[in-house]
Amino acid sequence: MTIELSIVIPMYNEEDNLEHLFARLLEVLTPLKITYEIICVNDGSKDKTLKQLIDCYQSNRQIKIVNLSRNFGKEIALSAGIDYAQGNAVIPIDADLQDPPELIHELVDKWREGYDIVYATRRSRQGETWVKQFTAKMFYKVIGRMTEIKIPPNTGDFRLMDRKVVNAIKQLPERTRFMKGLFAWVGYRQTFVLFDREPRFQGQTKWNYWKLWNFALDGIFSFSLLPLKVWTYLGSIISLLSLAYASFLILKTITLGVDVPGYASLMVAILFLGGVQLISLGVIGEYLGRVYEEVKARPLYLVSDLWGLEYLPLEKLN
């Protein structure tokens, strides 16, 4: 039997949310009168998430489980769920219920109108501090200016993707997965629906500011060469300024006979240029590190157990 809709849910320590998550999902999916599956990816949870998932699977075989061998991170867990999803349309959604399952109706309606990607754009972000809202806004502005692809602002992973979009994403092999960028890169006919993001239902977010910072860097370095170009421009400007200053000192000495003092200014210049060089080396190192990860060609993830699914051939995981 053909599955029309796959719901993909990455999970890490979400035992407190599962009961309400499935209750709301089933309440939404049942009236749609389409064949569906719910792909739950357990990303190395340390609580009772896996046990509760198995109990849910025993009572409802439309709930299927991908149990990863360890914690690979949300982006990889999401990729695993997309790999195993069989539906004609796929909807990734968070397990914390900040993305309302009730919006699935609107996503499906837009898909039936002929759109290939229907993303859910946040009109408001309840339960988040002003600092997080401000940094998120700045991130979308920065990455929008630094990359050639248009990543929709205020949009997470919650969206509907047609099967041809999913197949295109599965062909993208990079190990550093910035899924929002990959979703935008493939193109196709896109539209959006607005929603008010709810506070997290229970538990604490797994994303602290350090993780969010690294996530932002992954997005920038994965989709932009501007950080490399900046140092070319900066180096050229510093070289021209240094040449102009050196010419000024030479002329001043020749015409006025003034000695050139200043060990302090010399030390400041050396330290400044040393700092610039170290930062530029760090940027180059970020790109080289990503090249190193790619050439190792390890699988994106390893699956420990499956419930309701069959193992994919290893070549599909590379």
From Swiss-Prot:
Which CDD domains does the entry mention?
DPM1_like_bac
**Pfam families linked to this entry:** Glycos_transf_2
Tell me the protein's name.
Answer: Uncharacterized glycosyltransferase sll0501
Localization of this protein: Cell membrane
Query: Which keywords belong to this entry?
Result: Cell membrane, Glycosyltransferase, Membrane, Transferase, Transmembrane, Transmembrane helix
The reply to whether Membrane figures as a keyword in the UniProt entry is yes
UniProt-listed InterPro entries:
Glyco_trans_2-like, Glycosyltransferase_2, Nucleotide-diphossugar_trans
Write the lineage as a comma-separated list. Answer: Bacteria, Bacillati, Cyanobacteriota, Cyanophyceae, Synechococcales
> Quick check: keyword Ribonucleoprotein in the entry?
no
**UniProt topology in membrane:** Multi-pass membrane protein
Q: Which family does it belong to?
A: Belongs to the glycosyltransferase 2 family. GtrB subfamily.
What's an example of a GO molecular-function annotation for this chain? glycosyltransferase activity
- Which Gene Ontology cellular component annotation is one that this UniProt entry carries? plasma membrane
Which EC main class describes this enzyme?
Answer: transferase
- EC numbers listed for it are 2.4.-.-
Instruction: Give the source species.
Output: Synechocystis sp. (strain ATCC 27184 / PCC 6803 / Kazusa)
Q: Which residues cross the membrane?
A: 230-250, 264-284
